[in-house]
């Protein structure tokens, strides 16, 4: 880790007040990072010092010893660090990952007593990016992390998956009406169908809130189904009451958690969840009236998140549609309603102007949502 210029008095205060994470035996050349910073580990690396208290995301990628250019997938984990706290971890050489099991208390206390001597092997936390990190995580609490992180606590860019059925023998494939492995494949679709169904290894998947696929209540009339398909407030309220009964604002912590897992953890599934959750929030006009403070904070969150991603990132490479502009177009249209809180309405107007100036996104064209909506009715629901 490269040396950083820091005011001596500030450095002294941070040394005594900040938290320390010690990671023993991490191999030289490993890509290691904390929050918005990453480095290539040198031979003397033992961890990071002067870390401000709070939630942090540590991430790393192992490197092939025989071929240092071969870098493994990103892995990471969240830590909630206390003032003057000390966390002692070690590298598991067999699994090529950081062992997150707690170190014996005696070892921690011995390490604490030896911190002055260990100081030369600890890199200082880069305070130049602290404000950016806080802006991306200010709604992520310890409870958010405990609720969402995998049971293993390790967040992996590529999930470890296992086949739902082993199908080790030909008779197993026959039982599932699948052809023999040696049979010629006649089409791409047939090839896909032959692939085994996979599932994440137990304890390794991020435990995101389940989002509804049906946006209307059971027994809804055709008119109600259409209304709830245009304004997703019913579906959003279902999520808020079920997943965040104590504080609806906590949904923003999950939105930030998903974004960090994607941006710094390279977890594509987290990006997909972020999109689905954002879509639900932005297309809920009635909820904007009821939860105006939640939406004021949502705008602030999006302001910081969108500053970290290229403007064309959200454009579908096939359809050329931009998920974000179409979603925010509906949001800005709803925010103009006279029923919406004035503070929220004004903040939405300023945010729209900011995005138009920065990304040259057009939000004035008529939203596709204004076109007639074709809704699939459940079985048993008549139109007469």
UniProtKB/Swiss-Prot annotation:
GO terms for biological process: spliceosomal tri-snRNP complex assembly. Signal peptide: none annotated. Keywords: Acetylation, mRNA processing, mRNA splicing, Spliceosome. It holds the Pfam family AAR2_1st. GO terms for cellular component: spliceosomal complex. The keyword Acetylation applies. The keyword Acetylation applies. The modification N-acetylalanine is found at residue 2. It comes from the Eukaryota. Component of the U5 snRNP complex that is required for spliceosome assembly and for pre-mRNA splicing. Interacts with PRPF8 (via RNase H homology domain). Component of a U5 snRNP complex that contains PRPF8. PANTHER family: A1 CISTRON SPLICING FACTOR AAR2-RELATED, PROTEIN AAR2 HOMOLOG. Belongs to the AAR2 family. This is Protein AAR2 homolog. It comes from Bos taurus (Bovine). The lineage of its organism: Eukaryota, Metazoa, Chordata, Craniata, Vertebrata.
């Amino acid at each position: 880790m490269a040396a950083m210029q820091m005011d001596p008095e500030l450095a002294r205060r941070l040394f005594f007040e900040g938290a320390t994470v010690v990671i023993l035996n991490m191999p030289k050349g490993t890509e290691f990072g904390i929050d918005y910073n990453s480095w290539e580990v040198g031979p003397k690396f033992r961890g990071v010092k002067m870390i401000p208290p709070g939630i942090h995301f540590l991430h790393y990628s192992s490197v092939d010893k025989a071929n240092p250019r071969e870098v493994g997938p990103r892995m990471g984990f969240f830590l909630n660090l206390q003032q003057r706290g000390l966390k002692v971890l070690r590298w598991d050489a067999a699994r090529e990952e950081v062992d997150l099991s707690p170190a014996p208390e005696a070892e921690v206390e011995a390490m604490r007593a030896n911190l002055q001597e260990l100081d030369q092997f600890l890199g200082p936390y880069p305070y130049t990016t602290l404000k950016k990190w806080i802006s991306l995580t200010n709604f992520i609490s310890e409870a958010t992390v405990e609720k969402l992180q995998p049971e293993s606590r390790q967040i992996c860019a590529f999930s470890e998956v296992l086949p739902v059925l082993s199908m080790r023998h030909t008779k197993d494939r026959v039982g599932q009406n699948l052809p023999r492995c040696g049979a010629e494949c006649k089409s791409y679709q047939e090839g896909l169908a032959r692939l085994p169904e996979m599932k994440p290894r137990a304890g390794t998947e991020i435990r995101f809130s389940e989002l509804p696929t049906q946006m209307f209540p059971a027994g809804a009339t055709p008119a109600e189904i259409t209304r709830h398909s245009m304004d997703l407030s019913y579906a959003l309220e279902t999520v808020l009451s079920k997943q965040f009964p104590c504080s609806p604002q906590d949904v923003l912590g999950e939105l930030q958690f998903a974004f960090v897992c994607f941006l710094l953890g390279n977890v594509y599934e987290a990006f997909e969840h972020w999109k689905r959750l954002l879509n639900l929030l932005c297309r809920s006009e009635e909820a904007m009236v009821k939860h105006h403070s939640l939406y004021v904070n949502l705008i602030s969150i999006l302001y910081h998140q969108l500053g970290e991603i290229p403007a064309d990132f959200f454009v579908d490479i096939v359809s050329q549609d931009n998920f974000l502009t179409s979603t925010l177009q509906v949001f800005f249209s709803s925010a103009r309603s006279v029923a919406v809180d004035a503070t929220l309405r004004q903040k939405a107007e300023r945010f729209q102007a900011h995005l138009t100036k920065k990304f040259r996104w057009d939000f004035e064209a008529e939203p596709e949502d204004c076109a007639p909506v074709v809704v699939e009715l459940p079985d048993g629901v008549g139109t007469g």
